[in-house]
Amino acid sequence: LPISVFKVIRESWRGGQKTTTRTDYIKRVIGLPNDTIQMKEGRLYINGVKVARRPDGNFTPSARDGITYRQFIETLPNGVEHKILELGDNQRFDNTPIFKVPPNHYFMMGDNRDNSNDSRADVSFVPAENLVGRADIMFLSIDWRSEDWTDFDADIRWDRMLSAIGP
């Protein structure tokens, strides 16, 4: 399943005026129409089957906040492998109800599992008409959590520039 770009459109009323906002997200397609998705103790289940994963060391971002993520390689039911990051197995979205993906909708998740605003949160299911495209190349990568955010050049992650996204 590809990493996809999709839009979330929100409408609200302020001062008698209707306001519409659009936010683009880039997340991995995890659930297709009619699939069931659940997280149990930090593990992903698709249609009741635990998705395989194996340890792949640790990852420490360049920011000096001292956080180290556990890194895993996850294998989706179609055989596609990708890396995921986790802080632990009892974080905010590590134990969810079963999500049943409605017809013509998709369930999206970020690869940084414990720090992702995705279908487990307020993004919810993504209607097919909100899919914008597939993400294939990392154009620009910035460490926004760097302590010295005023030094823009130092925050660019040059090793990720123009690299392929996927699978």
Task: Label every PLM stretch briefly.
Residues 2-167:
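Soluble "head" domains of membrane/secretory-pathway proteins
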